[in-house]
Amino acid sequence: MLGAGGAARAIAAALCEAGVEHLTIANRNLDKARDLADLLVKELGFTAVSAQPLAQTDGADVDMIINSTSLGLHADDALPLALDHVSKHTVIADIIMVPADTKWLQDAVSRGLPIHYGRHMLDYQIDLIGRFTAAF
């Protein structure tokens, strides 16, 4: 997973609770990645987690890469991660909703990689809000 902010925390917790085998948190600020990894150990007892600098991440040998950074919100943003070393079966997911087709997802499609759009996150949030507000 790329990023260690608020959205990354929620996604990391959901992945751990869903039974992910291992989670690597890569972030520009290594201390923030380590803090999130430590939180997952402390609060969820999930120990198959590691942290590493984003600059040292190549995406090789993983099943999914989730961009939970802000990279991709603006047309001139750099790609969150080059996809040169990614397996053809690696799912590329982006939480950016606008634009829906970020440069990163476009790059993944051009390489024939499976992708997952950020819009799905909003759809589930709307569903949860609807259920929550209907309870009152």
What is the meaning of each model-derived region?
Residues 1-16:
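Glycine-rich adenosine-cofactor-binding loop
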Residues 1-2, 25, 94:
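Hydrophobic Val/Ile/Leu positions in short beta-strands of Rossmann-like dinucleotide-binding domains
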Residues 6-7, 70-73, 98:
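Short glycine-rich anion-binding loops that position phosphate/pyrophosphate groups of nucleotides
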Residues 13-17, 38-42, 106, 110, ...:
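Short, well-ordered alpha-helices that flank and scaffold nucleotide-derived cofactor binding pockets
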Residues 18-44:
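NAD(P)-binding Rossmann-fold cofactor-contacting core
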Residues 29, 56-78, 93:
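Rossmann-like NAD(P)-binding element
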Residues 44-55:
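Rossmann-fold cofactor-recognition segment
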Residues 75, 82, 88-136:
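Rossmann-fold NAD(P)-binding glycine/threonine-rich loop
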